[in-house]
């Protein structure tokens, strides 16, 4: 049985995600955006009526693209969530009550645009759903005819069905232009199309049958025509030959061909062209191919006919040039004074001037035709150029839409530290004089939208946070950061100096006036500083004093308890042994650190002072012998257990407090076995005595021997792999958790990013609402805002590969490494760290 796919997720295309990102309530908003981009009906509209408007995506688009003071009304069966500057009604568009509510809301107004994106509840048969949608469209058209102004537009959704053509015919009776289109945002598998009707005729009276679905969608039966009706009764007029033309073969001369007004018509009637003029026959243009073509014109093709027309043009130019030369020669002969010859030449010139004038007229006509042809060619080239430009703009627009650059609501980030139109960029009177024009109301609006409660203490703290963030996120440099915690205190001490410098800079600007007094501003800055997360764990002074007193009391109780314990052990240990124990460097080295070590030392010294009087000088030899017996014990570990000297006294060292030991997964598994069963614990202890155990110190055996023994002489633990893997998995989960400093650093980074994003959003809204600049400038400014706020493209992930010796400069891609990688070595790392240290020193010197 086949598995049914998820229908809902497949419908979440790019327009669905774009609607989520840009804040539109439905993906159908992009359909209206694309329709308006093509037909431009929202920019000029002052009143709009949206039928079946829920959930309000088309109302959002209309409010964005229409003028600010426009009237927008939305109607639907279900309630619509309120929108700014939009009136919503919950009515049924097929009832008279809805018409009355609209009249009450619009009063005497006529709307310029009526939108209809309604569709009935589908689920029945396709024929029934299509008819219901066509009926709903007809009702929407009825409301549009009641409230639409002359020349208005009606945009509606229609399903492709058998009722589509009747609807289209009704639209054409009421509007000048009716166009059907399918925007890109409409799904290809959907049967919906959008009809844009422009130029409402506003007739004085509309026939009510137009809005009656029984009449509008009535099927017209076309009567079938009979065979006799299909046969034409009128006899066509007989077409014969021209009057007086008794032959089909027409022979003409080349002179007639040159004098013909329409050479194409001449060639269609001629059968042969005779080259009877010897001078024209000897012309270079009269080739052998031309002679052959002139013999039988009826069999020529397009190429040969074009060659004959070109041949005619060349001969006409040759004849015109020859006639001009003859005319000039006649003028010269007339000016020579030979009257007799002049009379004769006049007669000849009279006969030749007439053809020369005719040739000039023909030449002028030819030049005129050539000029017209050139003008047509220029017009065609201009149209092609405009078409290419339009196609290029459309392609760029599609690319911008695909890249989410030309969508409403998409804002990028900051252009500067103080905003786009802030007065802090003007320093001095010289720059003030340059600002001669500007929209001061827009600037005041922008400044009023800026947050006044956000106070920045200093940029030094932000730099310090960035440094600590980098160190927190880099585990290798955690130790270095802990050693340089004093730098933060120094930066905080310099905070007041930096703020004083900033106040001096602000006082230099004559255009900026502080809104609050200096004392109030300093108090707010101090409160903001101590409200940071780093001071959240600090309590009041009273709680701190109480905590310190409790710690001191606990310390005194522990010291007294240790002194009493030493006094109880004192009778079991001779004074000489106690003295030796106190003076021995072995126990001084092995004493625990911290408060316990100090308390133990103080207790021992106190006991030594009390027993000092009871020790006589006669015991000096005994003490010297005891010191000699203690010499072999110096430098050895206390873990070897208690030792006995020659006199038989047992020396009991001070026991170390139990050290906290972190168990590995095998140790945790063994601990679980020990804690769960006494028998398993007993067996485990018995099995610990085996031939694999040895008690030699690490220094007594060679290192290679110890390594080999660890590898080959290991007894298997009495725990299963599943238990060990369980604790190993728990360790991995614990290690995967970030430490507290890393978590705090990430939280600080996220908080700063959100704050930066909020500031960027406000500045971007101010840029979008500015009327004085073009859309292209707005996009450029928004892009720069994104770039400066660091909200643009993410940084490319680079994989670092450690270079090996002897490989050379060219390194192939290692196995398992994808994307961009960089080859590094230890020398490069040291050089980079040295460079960073130098830069840090330079920064400290500047401060």
Curated annotation (Swiss-Prot):
Please give the residue positions where the record annotates the modification Phosphothreonine.
Answer: 573
Modification sites for Citrulline: 392, 783
| Protein's UniProt keywords contain Phosphoprotein | yes
Catalytic residues, per the record, are 157
What the entry says about post-translational processing? Citrullinated by PADI4.
- Region Disordered, as annotated, extends over 332-370, 457-510, 558-653, 811-847
**Record's keyword annotation contains ATP-binding:** no
- Reaction(s) catalysed (UniProt annotation): a ribonucleotide in rRNA + S-adenosyl-L-methionine = a 2'-O-methylribonucleotide in rRNA + S-adenosyl-L-homocysteine + H(+); a ribonucleotide in RNA + S-adenosyl-L-methionine = a 2'-O-methylribonucleotide in RNA + S-adenosyl-L-homocysteine + H(+)
Q: Which residues carry this modification: Phosphoserine?
A: 333, 335-336, 347, 356, 549, 584, 644, 676, 688
Q: Basic residues composition bias: which ranges?
A: 811-821
**InterPro entries for the chain:** RNA_methyltr_RlmE (IPR050082), RNA_MeTrfase_FtsJ_dom (IPR002877), rRNA-MeTfrase_E (IPR015507), rRNA_MeTfrase_SPB1-like_C (IPR012920), rRNA_MeTfrase_Spb1_DUF3381 (IPR024576), SAM-dependent_MTases_sf (IPR029063), SPB1-like (IPR028589)
Query: Where mainly found?
Result: nucleus
Cellular compartments annotated: Nucleus, Nucleolus
One term under GO cellular component: nucleoplasm
In short, the EC number is: 2.1.1.-
Which portions of the chain have biased composition (kind: Basic and acidic residues)?
Answer: 486-499, 822-838
Which sequence ranges form a coiled-coil region, renumbered to this chain?
Answer: 355-407, 739-777
EC top class, as a word: transferase
Q: Which GO terms describe its molecular function?
A: RNA 2'-O-methyltransferase activity; RNA binding; rRNA (guanine) methyltransferase activity; rRNA (uridine-2'-O-)-methyltransferase activity
Q: Which UniProt keywords apply?
A: Citrullination, Coiled coil, Isopeptide bond, Methyltransferase, Nucleus, Phosphoprotein, Ribosome biogenesis, rRNA processing, S-adenosyl-L-methionine, Transferase, Ubl conjugation
**Protein residues bound to S-adenosyl-L-methionine:** 56, 58, 76, 92, 117
Function text: RNA 2'-O-methyltransferase involved in the processing of the 34S pre-rRNA to 18S rRNA and in 40S ribosomal subunit formation. (Microbial infection) In case of infection by HIV-1 virus, recruited to HIV-1 RNA and catalyzes 2'-O-methylation of the viral genome, allowing HIV-1 virus to escape the innate immune system. RNA 2'-O-methylation provides a molecular signature for discrimination of self from non-self and is used by HIV-1 to evade innate immune recognition by IFIH1/MDA5. Mediates methylation of internal residues of HIV-1 RNA, with a strong preference for adenosine. Recruited to HIV-1 RNA via interaction with TARBP2/TRBP.
Q: Family membership, please give it.
A: Belongs to the class I-like SAM-binding methyltransferase superfamily. RNA methyltransferase RlmE family. SPB1 subfamily.
Assembly and oligomerization:
Interacts with NIP7.
Q: State the protein's name.
A: pre-rRNA 2'-O-ribose RNA methyltransferase FTSJ3
Q: Which gene encodes it?
A: FTSJ3
């Amino acid at each position: 049985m086949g598995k049914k796919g998820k229908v809902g997720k497949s419908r979440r295309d790019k327009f669905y995600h774009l609607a989520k990102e840009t804040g539109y309530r439905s993906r159908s908003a992009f359909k209206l955006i694309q329709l308006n981009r093509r037909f431009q009906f929202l920019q000029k509209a002052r009143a709009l009526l949206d039928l079946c408007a829920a959930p309000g995506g088309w109302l959002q688009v209309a409010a964005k693209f229409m003028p600010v003071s426009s009237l927008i009304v939305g109607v639907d069966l279900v309630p619509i969530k309120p929108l700014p500057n939009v009136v919503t009604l919950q009515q049924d568009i097929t009832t008279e009550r809805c018409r009355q509510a609209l009249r009450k809301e619009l009063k005497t107004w006529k709307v310029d645009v009526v939108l209809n994106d309604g569709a009935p509840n589908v689920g029945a048969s396709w024929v029934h759903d299509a008819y219901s949608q066509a009926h709903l469209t007809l009702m929407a058209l009825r409301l549009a005819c009641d409230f639409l102004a002359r020349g208005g537009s009606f945009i509606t959704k229609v399903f492709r069905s058998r009722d589509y053509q009747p609807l289209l015919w009704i639209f054409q009776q009421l509007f000048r232009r009716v166009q059907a289109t399918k925007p890109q945002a409409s799904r290809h598998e959907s049967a919906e199309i959008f009809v844009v009707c422009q130029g409402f005729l506003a007739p004085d009276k509309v026939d009510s049958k137009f809005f009656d679905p029984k009449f509008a969608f009535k099927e017209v039966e076309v009567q079938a025509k009979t065979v006799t009706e299909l046969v034409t009764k009128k006899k066509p007029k007989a077409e014969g030959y021209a009057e007086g033309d008794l032959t089909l073969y027409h022979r003409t001369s080349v002179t007639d061909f040159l004098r013909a007004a329409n050479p194409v018509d001449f060639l269609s009637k001629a059968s042969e062209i005779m080259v009877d003029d010897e001078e024209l026959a000897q012309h270079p243009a009269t080739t052998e191919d031309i002679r052959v073509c002139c013999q039988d014109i009826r069999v020529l093709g397009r190429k040969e006919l074009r060659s004959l027309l070109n041949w005619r043009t060349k001969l006409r130019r040759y004849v015109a040039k020859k006639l001009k030369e003859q005319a000039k020669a006649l003028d010269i002969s007339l000016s020579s004074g030979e009257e007799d010859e002049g009379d004769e030449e006049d007669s000849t010139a009279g006969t030749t001037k007439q053809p020369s004038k005719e040739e000039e007229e023909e030449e002028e006509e030819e030049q005129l035709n050539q000029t017209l042809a050139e003008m047509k060619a220029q017009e065609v080239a201009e149209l092609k150029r405009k078409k290419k430009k339009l196609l290029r703009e459309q392609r760029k627009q599609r690319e911008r839409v695909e890249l989410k650059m030309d969508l409403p609501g998409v804002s990028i980030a900051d252009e500067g530290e103080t905003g786009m139109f802030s007065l802090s960029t003007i320093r001095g009177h010289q720059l003030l004089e340059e600002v001669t024009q500007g929209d001061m109301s827009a600037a005041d609006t922008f400044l009023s939208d800026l947050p006044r409660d956000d106070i920045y203490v200093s940029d030094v703290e932000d730099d310090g946070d960035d440094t600590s963030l980098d160190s927190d996120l880099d585990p290798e440099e955690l130790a270095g950061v802990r050693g340089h915690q004093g730098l933060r205190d120094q930066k905080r001490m310099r905070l007041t100096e930096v703020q004083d410098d900033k106040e001096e800079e602000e006082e230099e600007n004559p255009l900026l006036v502080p809104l609050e007094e200096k004392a109030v501003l300093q108090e707010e800055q101090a409160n903001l500083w101590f409200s940071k997360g780093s001071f959240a764990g600090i309590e009041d002074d009273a709680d701190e004093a109480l905590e310190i007193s409790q710690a001191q009391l606990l310390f005194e109780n522990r010291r007294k308890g240790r002194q009493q314990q030493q006094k109880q052990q004192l009778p079991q240990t001779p004074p000489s042994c106690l003295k030796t124990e106190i003076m021995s460097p072995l126990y001084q080295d092995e004493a625990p650190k911290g408060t316990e070590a100090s308390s133990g030392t103080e207790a021992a010294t106190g006991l030594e002072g009390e027993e000092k009087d009871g020790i006589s000088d006669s015991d000096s030899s005994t003490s010297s012998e005891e010191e000699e017996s203690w010499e072999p014990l110096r430098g050895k570990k206390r873990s070897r257990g208690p030792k006995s000297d020659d006199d038989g006294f047992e020396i009991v060292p001070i026991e170390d407090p139990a050290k906290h030991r972190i168990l590995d997964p095998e140790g945790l598994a063994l601990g679980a076995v020990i804690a769960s069963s006494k028998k398993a614990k007993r067996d485990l202890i018995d099995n610990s005595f085996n031939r694999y155990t040895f008690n030699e110190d690490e220094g007594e055996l060679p290192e290679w021997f110890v390594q080999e023994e660890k590898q080959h002489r290991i007894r298997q633990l009495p725990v299963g792999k599943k238990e060990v893997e369980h604790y190993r998995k728990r360790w991995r989960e614990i290690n995967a958790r970030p430490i507290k400093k890393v978590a705090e650093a990430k939280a600080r980074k996220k908080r700063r990013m959100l704050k930066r994003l909020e500031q960027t959003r406000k500045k971007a809204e101010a840029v979008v609402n500015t009327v004085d600049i073009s859309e292209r400038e707005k996009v450029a400014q928004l892009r720069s805002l994104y770039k400066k706020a660091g909200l643009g493209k993410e940084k490319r992930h680079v994989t670092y590969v450690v270079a090996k010796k002897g490989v050379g400069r060219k390194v192939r891609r290692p196995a398992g490494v994808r994307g961009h990688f960089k080859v590094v070595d230890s020398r490069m790392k040291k050089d980079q760290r040295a460079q960073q240290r130098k830069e840090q020193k330079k920064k400290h010197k500047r401060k």
